[in-house]
A protein has these predicted regions:
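Short beta-strand->alpha-helix linker/helix-N-cap micro-motif
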Residues: 25-94, 109-116, 136-138, 177-181
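Catalytic-center loop of serine/cysteine hydrolases
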Residues: 78-80, 84-185
């Protein structure tokens, strides 16, 4: 994919959330970076490439719903990722994640990996300290009852909760955002991810088709409807 297409893909799929971190006064900025497919089987490769965008975008939506969190400027992250020549499904090591986090004024970066082995889904999220470059925590869906691809949204939600517990325990005491009380069928989430993928490639028509399919499965899907507004201007 050309670099300009990579930048567009990241601009529609990568978001920033913020939250207070233990031992730190006030809110801390957290940069959510691309996730890497570390070896998935059982579906078209296009779907796995799309999930590399859809998973961090969905994680960001989950984290941004908390009252103690704030959104930082998304464009700074896009520029930082582009300066590192990182695209969707890029492998982001701890040093690179820390460097990007510092560039965008974040205290922490969140990146990770996923793997789908014929329906058994594993999602790992890493918290990287911007100053030291160290991986502070790795969280995952290690509950054997929650490793089925059919429960992908709940898997992402579980990892988001674990990340939040590490970076912002106070946010968990602030109540449950409306977004966390919803459910997103895996088919809708997959179609949304494909919409992000095609939008990033500059194919607005195909992106619109996939966003339409996501909304057909789940009419109350704000992220997919926002995607439709972006690609169709309505």
């Amino acid at each position: 994919m050309p670099r300009w297409s990579i930048a567009r893909a990241l601009s529609v799929a990568v978001f920033i959330s913020a939250g207070p971190v233990a031992g730190q006064n006030g809110p801390a900025v957290i940069a959510i970076l691309p996730f890497e497919d570390r070896g998935s089987y059982g579906q078209d490769k296009e779907i796995f490439r799309a999930l590399a965008l859809g998973i961090p975008a969905t994680l960001a939506s989950e984290l941004s719903g908390h009252s103690n969190l704030r959104l930082a400027d998304r464009n700074r992250v896009v520029r930082a990722l582009r300066s590192e020549n990182l695209g969707p499904n890029a492998k982001v090591d701890a040093a690179t994640a820390a460097r990007i986090a510092k560039q965008v004024g974040a205290h922490y970066a969140i990146t990770g990996t996923f793997a789908d082995f014929y329906g058994t889904f594993r999602l790992d999220g890493r918290i990287v300290d911007a100053e030291s470059g160290q991986i502070l925590r790795v969280v995952t869906n290690n509950d054997p009852k929650l490793q089925d691809r059919a429960e992908l949204y709940r898997i992402i939600q579980m990892v988001a909760h674990k990340l939040l517990a590490e970076v912002s325990p106070a946010a968990l005491r602030g109540g449950t955002p409306q977004a966390e009380m919803r459910t997103i069928p895996t088919e809708a989430l997959t179609q949304y991810s494909l919409g992000l993928w095609y939008e990033g490639k500059g194919d607005r028509e195909k992106a619109g088709e996939h966003y339409d399919r996501a909304v057909a499965v789940l009419p109350d899907y704000p992220e997919a409807r926002e995607g439709l507004r972006r690609v169709r201007g309505s």
